[in-house]
Amino acid sequence: MNSSPGPAIALFLMFGGINGDSVVQTEGQVLPSEGDSLIVNCSYETTQYPSLFWYVQYPGEGPQLHLKAMKANDKGRNKGFEAMYRKETTSFHLEKDSVQESDSAVYFCALS
């Protein structure tokens, strides 16, 4: 029996911040196979208590809010993705247990 690997999912990663605050996330192109789990790191530096966001831009579309967390220990969820606002580690990592071809997009982390 001849089986071929499933389609690759392309995730392009960007970041954003304001007023001297900064966000650092996984850079470049990530190519998981369909069904793979995914973690996209997002860490931030700020002197405030920020709200945290993940945005997504699908091919041929403008950016749109993917998920958000307004305070520590909030968990944003959307389309099988989730991200936990972890104040103690200043992180908001985007995770999904099983990526699909329809997840191919540009993802970026931001704070306000």
Swiss-Prot record:
InterPro entries associated with the record: Ig-like_dom, Ig-like_dom_sf, Ig-like_fold, Ig_V-set, TCR_variable_region
Domain Ig-like: 21-112
Subcellular location(s) per record: Cell membrane
This protein's GO CC annotations: T cell receptor complex
Membrane found in the keyword field: yes
Disulfide bond sites: 42-109
Glycosylated position list: 41
Biological process, per Gene Ontology: adaptive immune response
Signal peptide positions on this chain: 1-20
Alphabetically ordered keywords of this record: Adaptive immunity, Cell membrane, Disulfide bond, Glycoprotein, Immunity, Immunoglobulin domain, Membrane, Receptor, Signal, T cell receptor
PANTHER family: T CELL RECEPTOR ALPHA VARIABLE 9-1, T-CELL RECEPTOR ALPHA CHAIN V REGION
Subunit relationships: Alpha-beta TR is a heterodimer composed of an alpha and beta chain; disulfide-linked. The alpha-beta TR is associated with the transmembrane signaling CD3 coreceptor proteins to form the TR-CD3 (TcR or TCR). The assembly of alpha-beta TR heterodimers with CD3 occurs in the endoplasmic reticulum where a single alpha-beta TR heterodimer associates with one CD3D-CD3E heterodimer, one CD3G-CD3E heterodimer and one CD247 homodimer forming a stable octameric structure. CD3D-CD3E and CD3G-CD3E heterodimers preferentially associate with TR alpha and TR beta chains, respectively.
Function: V region of the variable domain of T cell receptor (TR) alpha chain that participates in the antigen recognition. Alpha-beta T cell receptors are antigen specific receptors which are essential to the immune response and are present on the cell surface of T lymphocytes. Recognize peptide-major histocompatibility (MH) (pMH) complexes that are displayed by antigen presenting cells (APC), a prerequisite for efficient T cell adaptive immunity against pathogens.
Protein name: T cell receptor alpha variable 9-1
Protein species of origin: Homo sapiens (Human)
Encoding gene (name): TRAV9-1
